[in-house]
From Swiss-Prot:
Region (Disordered): 136-162
Keywords linked to the UniProt accession: Methylation, Ribonucleoprotein, Ribosomal protein, RNA-binding, rRNA-binding
N5-methylglutamine found at: Q160
Domain of life: Bacteria
Gene Ontology biological process: translation
Assigned protein family: Belongs to the universal ribosomal protein uL3 family.
Protein name from the UniProt record: Large ribosomal subunit protein uL3
Main function: One of the primary rRNA binding proteins, it binds directly near the 3'-end of the 23S rRNA, where it nucleates assembly of the 50S subunit.
Entry GO CC: cytosolic large ribosomal subunit
Assembly, per entry: Part of the 50S ribosomal subunit. Forms a cluster with proteins L14 and L19.
Single GO term (MF): rRNA binding
Length: 226
């Protein structure tokens, strides 16, 4: 397994349109997720001299001017770009950062068909759930002395020593609505005319949810390669 260079991790922001299937020339059906990555605007280029590290800050989407704070409005006005719905930055090498300027755009051509990518999004919220659904616990006995304790997790701590519940104990609670990353997804098709990426398989989040697409950080080396 090889690891991508930091300078090769420049990606795109987008929105999950939904899922569909396409057919190959051989007639095979391929499930894909359609990602809209249009109009990625560069809001800031960070350098080692001014910021201590190299990065490219990008915004996606459109937002009303009345919904933008004054500090953010001034920051975007300096770059000469329209306010977006999300703002992210990608750590890159100094050489890559030098290729971009504030006010420019990132094309969908950053990615190519057959390339491996990591897609990050916010998973669908499931509300309050128990330990069986949330943590894959097993239930208690259905009968033989069990009374009203069929789906309880059981003991959560010990008695006098240590006398407390350890942090991170798996218990009931809110499930989903967290940042998730699905790695090593194949790009099946790049639609430059409509600024769309068709990625094989599912990606985190609901329809119209925001996603971040980056080149895969864990690229599996082909068998037989040195």
């Amino acid at each position: 397994m090889t690891t991508a260079n930091p300078g090769d991790r420049l990606g795109l922001l987008g929105r999950k349109v939904g899922m569909m299937r396409i057919f190959t020339d051989d007639g095979d059906a391929v499930p894909v997720t359609v990602l809209d990555v249009s109009n990625n605007r560069v809001t800031q280029v960070k350098t080692v001299e001014t910021d201590g590290y190299s990065a490219i800050q990008v915004t996606f989407g459109a937002r009303k001017a009345s919904r933008v704070t004054k500090p953010e409005a001034g920051h975007l006005a300096k770059a000469g770009v329209e306010a977006g719905e999300i703002l992210r930055e990608f750590a890159v090498s100094a050489e890559v950062a030098a290729e971009y300027k504030p006010g420019g755009t990132l094309p969908v051509g950053l990615f190519a068909a057959g390339q491996k990518v990591d897609v990050q999004g916010t998973s669908i919220g499931k509300g309050f759930t128990g330990t069986i659904k949330r943590h894959n616990f097993g239930s208690q006995r259905a009968s033989h002395g069990n009374s009203r304790s069929h789906n309880v997790p059981g003991s959560i701590s010990m008695a006098q020593d240590p006398g407390r519940v350890f942090p991170g104990k798996k218990m009931s609670g809110h499930r989903g609505d967290v940042t998730k990353t699905t790695q090593n997804l194949d790009i099946v098709r790049v639609d430059e005319a409509r600024q769309l990426l068709l990625v094989r398989g599912a990606v985190p989040g609901a329809k119209n949810g925001f996603v971040t697409v980056r080149p895969a950080v864990k690229v599996k080396a082909k068998k037989g390669a040195n």
